[in-house]
From Swiss-Prot:
Lineage top rank: taxon: Bacteria
Source species of the chain: Mycobacterium tuberculosis (strain ATCC 25618 / H37Rv)
GO BP field: mycothiol biosynthetic process
Function of the protein: Catalyzes the deacetylation of 1D-myo-inositol 2-acetamido-2-deoxy-alpha-D-glucopyranoside (GlcNAc-Ins) in the mycothiol (MSH) biosynthesis pathway. Shows some amidase activity toward S-conjugates of mycothiol.
Protein name as annotated: 1D-myo-inositol 2-acetamido-2-deoxy-alpha-D-glucopyranoside deacetylase
GO MF annotations, alphabetized: hydrolase activity, acting on carbon-nitrogen (but not peptide) bonds, in linear amides; N-acetylglucosaminylinositol deacetylase activity; zinc ion binding
GO cellular component, one term: plasma membrane
């Protein structure tokens, strides 16, 4: 197929794209694919690492969201994506915070009118016409309310984008997304990667997670696809994570990173997926696709 492949990743906050799909995004952009990332909020309720940005948080100046626009822009540039896309425009819906976070605004993403959120994403899908859409599983990966809601909104938008044409809620020509994936954490890959870390990879304050702290991962038999990126793509992922400096610290060797909880996780080149919609392409001996574009008529290189 001579057409340029198009992939769309839908995430809740800045940094989610790099943590979950950084190597995948870099893998496809380096092969000439058109990749876009939609971010649903500015991540205003995020914690920050260290004192340097402490006054930006919601409890102080409440300027973290605006600052994170710059972080996301730099991270996407490292991954080969030209610019971020914010659902409804930057700042339209606010980070809802973790479960139990005080409601600071009537614009919380989880409280938004679904006609508006789904409609905004349908418009993006119909404009970009992606061959692949990626978002979280129904649990939002680890259960963050915005991640769960992003799954709900994206699932509804993928379905609605292919139905009808030119309505007030869903303008534009319909587009049926050929393949729809959930991004998931491959548990065995994470455990193997964590076991391979050595003290030189870690900062002194970091600890390796216990098994119950990574219980949201998927076993191998629950996975449908893997993107096994090369070292160049993994290096781009490291650079993207480093760009999210309010949220992520990359270790001294670039083999591990941690959030504000100081749990050290390996920075993996392999990223895993579950096929939620569309037909699978060729699978390997593990029963996994090794290309999200498999079965769509593109060449093995993804272009």
């Amino acid at each position: 197929m001579s057409e340029t492949p198009r992939l769309l990743f839908v995430h809740a906050h800045p940094d989610d794209e790099s943590l979950s799909n950084g190597a995948t995004i870099a893998h496809y952009t380096s092969r000439g694919a058109q990749v876009h990332v939609v971010t649903c909020t500015l991540g205003e309720e995020g914690e920050v690492i260290g004192d340097r940005w402490a006054q930006l948080t919601a409890d102080h100046a409440d300027q973290l969201g605006g600052y994170r626009i710059g972080e996301l822009t730099a991270a996407l540039r490292a991954l080969g994506v030209s610019a971020p896309i914010y659902l409804g425009g930057a700042g339209r819906w606010r980070d809802s915070g973790m479960a139990g976070t005080d409601q600071r605004s009537q614009r919380r993403f989880v409280d938004a009118d679904p006609r508006q959120t789904v409609g905004a994403l349908v418009a993006i899908i119909r404009e970009l016409r992606p061959h692949v859409v990626v978002t979280y599983d129904p649990n939002g990966g680890y259960g963050h309310p915005d991640h769960v809601h992003t799954h709900t909104v994206t699932t509804a938008a993928v379905a609605a984008a292919g139905v009808g044409s030119g309505t007030a809620d869903h303008p534009g020509d319909p587009w049926t997304v050929p393949k729809f994936y959930w991004t998931v954490l491959g548990l065995s890959a994470l455990i193997s990667g964590a076991r391979a870390l050595v003290p030189d990879d870690l900062r002194p304050e970091w600890v390796l997670p216990r098994a119950d702290e990574i219980a949201f991962g998927y076993s191998d038999d629950g996975i449908d696809a893997v993107v096994e990126a090369d070292e160049q793509a993994r290096a781009a992922k490291v650079a993207a994570l480093a760009a999210h400096a309010t949220q992520v610290v990359v270790g001294p060797t670039g083999r591990a990173a941690a959030l504000s909880n100081n749990l050290a996780l390996p920075i993996l080149a392999d990223e895993h997926y579950v096929l939620a919609g569309g037909s699978a392409g060729a699978r390997d001996e593990r029963g996994w696709e090794t290309d999200l574009l498999a079965g769509l008529g593109f060449t093995a290189s993804g272009t």
